[in-house]
Amino acid sequence: MNLIGYIEERFQNLELIPSIYNQWGTGIHFCLGENIYQLKANEELNLKMFRIVYEQTSIIFNELFEQNDDIFLVTNMYKHKKKEKCIRKLKVYQPFLKCKNHLNQIMVKTYPYPFEINKAEEYEMQQFSLLCKPRDLRVTELLKAASNEDFPQKPKFGGYSIDYPDVFFVNITKDIIFFIYDDRGCEVIAHDFKRIRPLYEKYHDWVEEYKCM
């Protein structure tokens, strides 16, 4: 199964770009960090807040994914069409894969740049996807890198020049998609709300909003 075929079958008309929650009728939008500001009064990073974010994203991931689930790890990379001919997938995936042989299985498809900016036609989105299992990934590092988008601490995603990469965890065993947009929050959507209802009930205090059509 490929990513495009799966999305067309189970999440029809969904685009794997930020704000998947707003595109789909069943999902949860979580607020991360317990409303603690990212910086201290002296402008240093508030590491306590980041520790809370890392813990929350890890808890949510482990509630949604089991080690043997089949998943697509999807990464959107954004680039200038002429200034950058290609993006090296090694920079995108290598630090987060336990087995480097998986690098040969990564698929890529190019799309128009999805955001509204001046001269958007000069840019494009390359969407990488890898069919794997959570046990194949350095999940903790992936979750931290997604949360660290706006701040310098590591781990970070590499290989980008204009916009920070967006990473989606697509669970094809359970028909769930998980997306961390930055340290402020994350989104979970599902083909059937019953798959994510236990998560909603257990961590209701973190929920910003939800939909259960």
Swiss-Prot record:
Q: Tell me what this protein is called.
A: Uncharacterized protein YnaE
What organism does the record attribute this protein to? Bacillus subtilis (strain 168)
Q: Per UniProt, what is one Pfam family of this protein?
A: DUF3885
